[in-house]
Amino acid sequence: IPGNMYFTTTRLHQELAGGRFVDVIIDEAHDPESLHAFKGDIDLGKLETLVKKHGAGRIPYICVATTVNMAGGQPVSMANLKELRSFTAKHGIKVMLDMTRIAENAWFIQQREKGYARRSVASIVKEICGYTDGATFSGKKDALVNIGGFLALNDKDKFEEASNLVVVYE
């Protein structure tokens, strides 16, 4: 399961389900001296190599965190999300968004990315979500509660499947 770094519990759940995490974040994310404005971006070259090696059918989804906690809260650019969506549409791969800190990521886009300075954070959040097939959100972070979260899916069948599992795991 390719992703822009990982969050510990997300990676654990992926591995418990039989997946294997593969980091496809840009190299600048690992360089504290780099001044790259969007160190959370997916390296599409690394992703392309992974798809060629394993085949798109063996990649259930790409996990994109906004912002990337393990990289010190680094944001993902809208341009990168658009390119990722184009890539995944071509290969039939889903994009799942960890949107726990999406408001901060949207603010960084507003402040740093050309064409977004006059856009509201809310409209940027909506655009980000439009490039994905589903999202997870942890209420334990910015929502200021000690428990909870949600899963949103564009696929009704996957939604029904997940709803049935909630009964077992809630």
PLM-predicted stretches and their roles:
Residues 1-170:
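Conserved PLP-enzyme active-site core in the AAT-like
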